[in-house]
Amino acid sequence: MEKQDLEKIESDIINDWTEADDLDDALDFLFMEKVSEFKIKFKDPLKVTEEEYRELLGNYDSSNSVSSNGITIDQYTYDEDDDIMYKLEFTYRKEDNKIYIYEVQGWREKKK
């Protein structure tokens, strides 16, 4: 992938990822390459355990959550440096001690 392609990434619907490790590898890549914005949607929700979900989140600095009709949106903030913060937003439902992830978005913002 070319560097100029990394400024903004919006995926096609992804339907071949079946494990949390696939998403974890993608998130690591996006963080390391300092992608300014991305969105990943799943045709079939990615099923993860609560432990795998926590591992995907890593060490965040703050969080916010809202739920409606069984769907939850969690937003996590990570301090990147003095001027920039990184945000991750997960849209999912929880059922039978599993988390079904529909979408993940990430973006960088200047701190206010």
From Swiss-Prot:
<dbReference type="Pfam" id="PF07118">
    <property type="entry name" value="DUF1374"/>
</dbReference>
<dbReference type="InterPro" id="IPR009804">
    <property type="entry name" value="SIFV_Orf14"/>
</dbReference>
<protein>
    <recommendedName>
        <fullName>Uncharacterized protein 14</fullName>
    </recommendedName>
</protein>
